Amino acid sequence: GLSFVCILLVINSIFISCSKDEDKPGSTGLNLFSIEDDKKLGQQLDQEISANPQQYPILDPSQFAQSYEHLARITNTLLNTGKLRHRDDFVWQYKIIRDDEVLNAFCAPGGYMYVYTGLIKFLDKESELAGVMGHEIAHADLRHSTETMTRDYGLQTLLEIVLGGNSGTVTTIAANLAKLKYSRRNETEADEASVAYLCNTVYD
C-alpha cells in the first residue's frame, strides 16, 4: 500500500520527463515463485478479502458502475501500453473499498488491485489517480508482492498457501496486505515503471 507521503511522491513523479528507453521495466530482485504461484496466492488473498466485509467493505460494481468504469478506463490505458511484462499472464482486476478516511491503494500478487474511496476522492485529477494505479500495477507486474511476502512470512509458509493449506496464515496476510512494506528498491522500481506506463498516454 501507499502512505500519504508516498502518494504525493508518486503523483509528483508523473511530471518527470519520459525516458527514451522503450524496454519494459524490470525488477532486480530474486523471486522463487512461478507466475502461476503468484496468481494462486493472489486469488486466495482476494477470496479472503472479499469474505471480510468488516475490514474490507467492497463496493458492489452493479451499484457503483460509474466508479468502476472510471477505474476501468485508467487501468486499461496503463495495461495496454505494451510496457508490462505480465500483461497477459495476470488477472488485473480491481475492487473499490468503501472507506473515505483511508488514502490508500494496494495490489495482491497476480494483479488483484484494491483502491479506497478516500484516495479516489482526495485526488483532484484523473492523471493523479493513474499515477498511483500505475505504481500498484508495477508492484504486481514486477512481482514485488511475492518477493516481499517471502521476506516477511517465509517461503515455506507461502508455498503451503499456494497448495491450499495454512488458512490461518492466509487470513493474517490478507488482513495486513494494505500495510505491506516494500523495500526502498521496490518502491523506486514501481515509481519508475509507473512513469514509463504513463508516457505517451493521455496522462503524460
Where do the model's predicted regions map?
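Bacterial N-terminal signal peptides that target proteins for export
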Residues: 1-5
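Post-HEXXH active-site segment of zinc metalloproteases
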Residues: 145-175
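Peri-catalytic and regulatory segments of divalent metal-dependent proteins
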Residues: 20-137, 141-153, 200-201
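Metalloprotease/metallohydrolase-associated module, dominated by Zn2+-dependent proteases
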Residues: 36-39, 166-204
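N-terminal leader-region detector that preferentially activates on the first domain or presequence
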Residues: 8-9
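C-terminal motif of bacterial Sec signal peptides marking the signal peptidase cleavage site
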Residues: 13-17
